[in-house]
């Protein structure tokens, strides 16, 4: 066997059949779809169930979006251990430390994890357990 005698495996290089490109090709005009009817047309729209009432219309609408909702950026106690002992933790300091991407409507401190440092924390909201843990560690909480 020589390099110039190499041939692809039988059936591995099948030419794609281009339909709807003239009658003489054997697959022109109706392009192998037969005559009229649903199967001769293009696809049905998304969510179409053959004329039966589709699922998205059978299920009732629920709820609404409250335009006055304030979304807080949440920070757990365990994340505050990156600050030095006696430091003042402000929203700007949290953004600078990379703990929070953006402040949104403010920052809420949650009580998940342990706090091992004495910190003065300034935030929009505190959970009860977070406030207790900060004060138990000798720190202070301040609502801004």
Curated annotation (Swiss-Prot):
Per UniProt, the ranges with Gly residues bias are 23-35
* Annotated GO biological process: translation
Write down a Pfam family by its short name: Ribosomal_L27A
Tree of life domain: Bacteria
Which species is this record about?
Answer: Levilactobacillus brevis (strain ATCC 367 / BCRC 12310 / CIP 105137 / JCM 1170 / LMG 11437 / NCIMB 947 / NCTC 947) (Lactobacillus brevis)
HAMAP family registered for this protein in UniProt = Ribosomal_uL15
Q: What is this protein called?
A: Large ribosomal subunit protein uL15
Residue span of region Disordered: 1-47
| Residue ranges, compositional bias (Basic and acidic residues) | 1-13
Lineage of the species this protein comes from? Bacteria, Bacillati, Bacillota, Bacilli, Lactobacillales
Q: Which gene encodes it?
A: rplO
InterPro entries linked? Ribosomal_uL15 (IPR030878), Ribosomal_uL15/eL18 (IPR021131), Ribosomal_uL15/eL18_sf (IPR036227), Ribosomal_uL15_bac-type (IPR005749), Ribosomal_uL15_CS (IPR001196)
Question: Keywords for this entry?
Answer: Ribonucleoprotein, Ribosomal protein, RNA-binding, rRNA-binding
> Which family does the record assign?
Belongs to the universal ribosomal protein uL15 family.
State a GO cellular component annotated for this protein. cytosolic large ribosomal subunit
Q: Does the keyword Repeat apply?
A: no
- Which terms does the record give in the GO molecular function aspect? rRNA binding; structural constituent of ribosome
Q: How does it assemble?
A: Part of the 50S ribosomal subunit.
Its function, per the record, reads: Binds to the 23S rRNA.
């Amino acid at each position: 066997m020589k390099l110039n005698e190499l041939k692809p495996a039988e059936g591995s290089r099948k030419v794609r059949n281009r339909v709807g490109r003239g009658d003489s090709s054997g697959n022109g005009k109706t392009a192998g779809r037969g005559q009229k009817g649903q199967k001769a047309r293009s696809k049905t729209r998304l969510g179409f169930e053959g004329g039966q009432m589709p699922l998205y219309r059978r299920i009732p609408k629920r709820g609404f979006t409250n335009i006055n909702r304030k979304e807080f950026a949440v920070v757990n106690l365990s994340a505050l251990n990156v600050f030095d002992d006696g430091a003042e933790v402000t929203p700007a300091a949290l953004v600078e430390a990379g703990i929070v991407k953006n402040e949104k409507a403010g920052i809420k401190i949650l009580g998940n994890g342990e706090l091992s440092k004495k910190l003065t924390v300034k935030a929009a909201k505190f959970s009860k357990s977070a406030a207790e843990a900060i004060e138990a560690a000798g720190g202070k909480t301040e609502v801004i």
